[in-house]
Structures are given as structure tokens and as C-alpha cells.
């Protein structure tokens, strides 16, 4: 079938053609960027925490005098350990998806002439890495001598565990064991590498630094107090957490229990990504509504043109055009309109992405989203025009030629 007659017919209906093409262009721009944003949200929700989430709970206390930190830790650990089902209790500064407790800029040289990034750190007492379920991939876990008293925020010259991602960032292609890095006046020596340990408060700027963390073994006391890691069997954990809140009221009645942060790690993760799930749902709804409106627009225009061209269709049928010819005519016509809209929509999609990058720090839109969006809209256009096209192909030649 020749394209020229179809283009000539479209030129006679320029306004309607342009409106549908613009609608498709808008749908293409929104579809590509919305799908990209949904993919980013889903990707962020799949971040690997590196800890045994189903077995861990977190208790956070405040409102106590730092002078009683050692006594408070002892009382709380004893009270929580007495709960049936609790396997171990450890002092820790925070957990993944919990309150942000520690971040620091680090350098590879003591002079700090060049910053090597801002990372988050965890601190915990003896047995904490094992209770967290960290997967060691190189080196060894901290031994008893590595758990030193705090000298300010950190012990003196601590021996630390770092994540594989941070090791690759600091020393790409090198063995990180025995390497040192600095933060202010403290230097840290790497004794082990773990597969994963997510930062406490994951942000939406990308996953590049989501695993830039290190673990500092330390003796509880001072700044390392008031936050506790509970390790229990997954089937007992919810019951244990209820009992733990009640136990705190008995063993430490004068402190404030942070009920917002004191939950299982699984719950903290679920709550942390609640906004992402809601936003993904909203974007899916926007996409569905936009595609529905676009499809209805195509159906409406095609139905109008079929009604308007009944006499022309009948004449073509009378001079030998088959139903297949009529069907293909409307399908090709739709394909041309949709293609024009897609070409403009790809430019709009790129421009919209630049705006989102500037104002919302969204990453650059990968190019493969454009052909995916085009295929979706081509398919939608063909499905939308199919009903009116079949009705046009079913018009009897005699009836059509008699209609005015």
C-alpha cells in the first residue's frame, strides 16, 4: 500500500493529526521518565543490607547522663538477655535503616590534602559483627584485643572491618588488608573485608556510596551506649521486641525509650522504603491513566474518521479493495501518526530528564528507555485503532456508496 495517499489524507485533517501526535509525544516523555523513576525506586528498595535482618531487633534509649553509661549498658544487657528467646544482646551505635549515628570524611593521607569521600561507620561491642551476620570475604573478624575503650568518638588506632565496595573505592584492584586511612586525627587499619554493610540512611542520589561503611570494634561506654542490638530466632523476634520494651521500663525506668526507632530491622527497612513504594504506585497509576487517555483519543479519532469516510470506504470496496486493504490503511495511518508523536516525544523525554536531573538529582535517562517507550506506544496505537479499523473493513460496499 502506498504511503502518499495516506499522508495526503492526513494533511486534510492537520489539526486532529497534530493533537493526537502531541498527545502521544507527551505520553512518550512521561512514560520513559516515569518508568525510569520506578526502576530507580525498585532498585533502591533491593539494596543488600549485609545483616541478618529477620533475626535482629534494635532498642534505642535517650535522656540519660553519660556518666552512668557503663552502668546503664550493664543493666539493659542483663535485662534484655533474660528475655526467653534472646540469643545475645550487644551495644551498637545503629543498624541499617535505623537512625543515623555516625558519618565521617576519610582520607588516605594524614595531611588530609585530598578527601576520599564521606562514609558511615558502625561501632559495636564484642560479638557484634557475628550477631549482625556480616559475611567476611577477606581477613578476620575483630578479636578481644581489638575492642578498645573510646578516646572521644573512636578508640585509639582502631582495627576495623570495611565493606568490599569501600575497599574497591579506596584501593581499586589492591589488597586492602593492612591498609590505613584517616579521619581527622584518628587512623584506622583494615583487618577484614565484609561483603556488604549498608549505610544507615540510604539516600536517592544513587547506590554508588550505599555500601561505603566500616565497622569499629569498641568497648561499650561513653558515646557507645543507649543503643542495643538484639539477636533472636526469627519466629521469636516480634515477641521478644514486645518483651524488650516492657523490660526497659523495669531495668531503666528513668530513661526515654525511642519507640520510633526501637523495632525489628525488618520493620525498619519496610518503613524506610514506604515512601518509595508509594511513589512507585503513584507513578504506575499516572502511566496507566496516561496510556488510557491516549488510547481513548486514538479510538475516538479513528472512529470519527471511519464515520466521516464511509462513502470513500465504500467506493474503494466497490472498485476491488479488500477488507484487509481497508484494515491496513487505518493501521498504517495510525502508525505514521504515532511515529511522528514518538519522534517528538523522545526529544521531550530527554528534555524532561534534564529538568529532573537539575532539580531532583535524578540520574541521566538511559537511552534504552526510548525504544522501549516507542514499542509500547506503537503497540498501544495498533490495539486502539484495531476496533475502528475492523468496523471500517466491515462496511458493505453497497451501503457505503448509498450514504451521503
Where are the regions that the model predicts?
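Membrane-helix entry/capping segments
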Residues: 1, 8, 12, 16, ...
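C-terminal membrane-exit region of the final transmembrane helix in multipass inner-membrane proteins
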Residues: 2-3, 374-404
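Intracellular coupling helices
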Residues: 4-11, 15, 296-337, 394-403
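Hydrophobic alpha-helical transmembrane segments of multi-pass inner-membrane transport and secretion
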Residues: 12-39, 275-311, 339-340, 344, ...
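Alpha-helical transmembrane segments
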Residues: 26-54, 357
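Membrane-interface junction motifs in transport/secretion proteins
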Residues: 43-71
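Mid-to-C-terminal secondary-structure elements
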Residues: 82-88, 94-272
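Transmembrane alpha-helical interface segments in multi-pass membrane proteins
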Residues: 290, 311-357, 372, 376, ...
Amino acid at each position: 500500500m502506498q504511503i502518499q495517499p495516506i499522508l495526503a489524507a492526513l494533511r486534510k485533517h492537520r489539526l486532529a493529526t497534530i493533537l493526537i501526535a502531541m498527545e502521544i509525544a507527551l505520553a512518550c516523555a512521561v512514560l520513559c521518565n516515569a518508568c525510569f523513576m520506578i526502576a530507580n525506586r525498585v532498585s533502591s528498595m533491593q539494596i543488600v543490607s549485609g545483616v541478618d535482618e529477620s533475626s535482629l531487633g534494635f532498642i534505642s534509649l535517650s535522656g540519660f547522663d553519660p556518666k552512668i553509661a557503663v552502668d546503664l549498658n550493664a543493666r539493659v544487657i542483663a535485662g534484655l538477655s533474660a528475655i526467653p528467646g534472646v540469643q545475645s544482646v550487644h551495644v551498637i551505635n545503629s543498624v541499617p535503616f535505623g537512625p543515623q549515628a555516625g558519618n565521617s570524611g576519610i582520607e588516605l593521607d594524614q595531611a588530609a590534602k585530598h578527601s576520599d569521600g564521606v562514609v558511615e561507620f558502625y561501632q559495636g561491642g564484642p560479638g557484634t559483627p557475628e550477631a549482625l551476620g556480616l559475611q567476611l570475604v577477606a581477613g578476620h573478624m575483630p578479636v578481644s584485643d581489638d575492642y578498645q575503650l573510646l578516646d572521644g568518638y573512636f578508640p585509639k588506632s582502631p582495627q576495623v572491618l570495611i565493606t568490599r565496595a569501600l575497599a574497591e573505592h579506596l584501593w581499586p584492584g589492591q589488597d586492602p588488608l593492612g591498609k590505613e586511612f584517616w579521619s581527622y586525627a584518628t587512623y584506622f587499619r583494615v583487618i577484614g573485608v565484609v561483603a556488604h554493610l549498608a549505610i544507615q540512611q540510604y539516600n536517592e542520589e544513587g547506590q554508588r556510596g550505599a555500601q561505603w561503611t566500616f565497622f569499629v570494634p569498641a568497648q561499650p561506654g561513653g558515646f557507645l551506649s543507649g543503643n542495643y542490638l538484639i539477636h533472636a530466632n526469627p519466629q521469636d523476634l516480634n515477641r521478644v521486641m514486645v518483651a524488650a520494651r516492657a523490660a526497659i521500663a523495669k531495668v531503666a525506668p528513668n530513661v526515654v525509650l525511642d519507640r520510633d526507632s526501637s523495632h525489628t530491622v525488618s520493620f525498619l527497612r519496610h518503613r524506610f522504603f514506604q515512601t518509595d513504594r508509594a511513589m512507585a504506585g503513584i507513578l504506575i497509576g499516572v502511566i496507566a491513566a496516561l496510556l488510557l487517555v491516549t488510547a481513548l483519543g486514538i479510538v475516538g479519532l479513528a472512529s470519527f474518521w471511519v464515520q466521516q469516510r464511509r462513502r470513500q470506504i465504500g467506493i474503494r470496496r466497490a472498485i476491488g479493495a479488500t477488507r484487509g486493504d481497508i484494515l491496513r490503511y487505518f493501521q498504517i495511518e495510525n502508525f505514521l501518526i504515532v511515529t511522528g508523536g514518538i519522534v517528538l516525544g523522545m526529544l521531550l523525554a530527554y528534555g524532561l530528564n534534564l529538568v529532573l536531573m537539575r532539580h531532583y538529582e535524578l540520574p541521566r535517562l538511559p537511552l534504552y528507555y526510548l525504544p522501549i517507550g516507542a514499542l509500547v506506544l506503537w503497540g498501544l496505537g495498533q490495539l486502539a485503532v484495531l476496533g475502528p479499523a475492523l468496523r471500517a473493513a466491515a462496511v458493505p460496499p453497497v451501503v457505503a456508496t448509498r450514504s451521503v
